[in-house]
Design a protein with these regions (language model features):
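A conserved structural/catalytic subdomain of Rossmann-like adenosyl-cofactor enzymes
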Residues: 100-255
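Conserved S-adenosyl-L-methionine
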Residues: 3-108, 113-115, 120-124, 129-134, ...
C-alpha cells in the first residue's frame, strides 16, 4: 500500500520540482517546510544535476519517525551529509533555518487544514512571517500559515510551489484577507488546478499555488489541468507529457 502511495505522488512531485526550479540556472538551496520523508526534495535532486543546487537540501518535519525516515532517505539517495539539513520540530511555532534564508526554491505539500494555536498565542501576530498579512490563519486551518511561512523564506529571485486544498482559495474571513494581501503585493504567480485522485488518501482535486517575488506584471495565471490525467487502477497519474504540457503553459503565462 505505501509503495502505491509513493508512486501516486511521484508525478505530482515531479511537476512541483520543475515549477520551483523553472528557468533558474542555479539555486542556492532548496527547502521544504513540511518535509515528510523528503520525497519532494529528492524529486528535485533527481531532476536537476547536483551542481545546480549549490548549498543543498533543507527541510523541517514535525513527526519524529518521518523525520528519521527523511534523513535515511537522503543517505539512501547519496546526498552527502554536508549537503542536507533536516530538522525536527513544528515549522509554524518553532521554525528552523531562519539564518539560512532566503531560499531560491521552496517545494511543499503541507498538511491540509490542520489545527494550530493561531490567535491564542498573542506573539504570533508580531512574528515577521505572519505580521505583514495583518491577520493569522484560522485556528482550525493552518494552511495559509504554511504559505506565509514559505513566502517569508523565499528569495527575491526564487519560486515556491505549494500543494493546497481548494478551500483556501474561496473561503471568507481571515483566509480572504490573507489572499488579498498576497494578490495586492503581487506574490501569486500561478494557481494550477489538478485532476482528482492524484494524491495520497484523497480523491479531492488539489491545487498548486506558485509564489514569486519577481513578477513584473500585476496578473495571476490560472491553469486548469483538471482534465490532464491517465487513469490507472484506483488512481490517476500525470504522465511526463502532461507535465510538459503544464510547464509549457506555465512558461507562456497564458491562462
Amino acid at each position: 500500500k505505501s509503495g502505491e502511495t509513493l508512486f501516486k505522488t511521484q508525478s505530482v512531485s515531479k511537476l512541483i520540482a520543475q515549477i520551483a526550479m523553472h528557468k533558474q540556472e542555479t539555486v542556492n538551496k532548496i527547502y521544504d517546510p513540511a518535509a515528510g520523508s523528503g520525497s519532494l526534495l529528492l524529486q528535485a535532486k533527481k531532476h536537476f544535476d547536483n551542481h545546480i543546487i549549490e548549498e543543498g537540501f533543507f527541510g523541517q518535519e514535525i513527526n519524529h519517525t518521518t523525520y528519521n525516515l527523511a534523513r535515511m532517505n537522503m543517505f539512501l539517495h547519496n546526498v552527502n551529509y554536508d549537503k542536507f539539513n533536516i530538522k525536527l520540530g513544528n515549522t509554524l511555532l518553532d521554525p528552523h533555518f531562519g539564518e539560512d534564508r532566503p531560499f531560491d526554491a521552496i517545494v511543499s505539500n503541507p498538511p491540509y487544514s490542520v489545527k494550530w494555536i493561531g490567535s491564542d498565542d498573542t506573539t504570533l501576530i508580531n512574528d515577521e512571517r505572519f505580521a505583514p498579512a495583518g491577520v493569522l490563519a484560522p485556528k482550525s486551518k493552518a494552511d495559509f500559515a504554511f504559505v506565509l511561512h514559505a513566502l517569508n523564506y523565499l528569495s527575491s529571485k526564487g519560486r515556491a510551489a505549494i500543494v493546497c486544498f481548494p478551500g483556501i482559495f474561496y473561503r471568507g474571513g481571515a483566509e480572504q484577507k490573507i489572499r488579498q494581501y498576497l494578490v495586492d503585493n503581487n506574490y501569486v504567480e500561478t494557481v494550477i488546478s489538478l485532476a482528482p485522485n492524484l494524491f495520497f488518501g484523497t480523491s479531492i482535486s488539489v491545487n498548486i499555488l506558485v509564489l514569486s517575488k519577481h513578477k513584473t506584471e500585476g496578473k495571476t495565471q490560472f491553469i486548469d489541468a483538471s482534465k490532464l490525467f491517465k487513469s490507472e487502477t484506483n488512481t490517476n497519474v500525470l504522465t511526463d507529457a502532461h507535465i510538459e504540457q503544464i510547464m509549457t503553459l506555465f512558461d507562456t503565462k497564458e491562462d
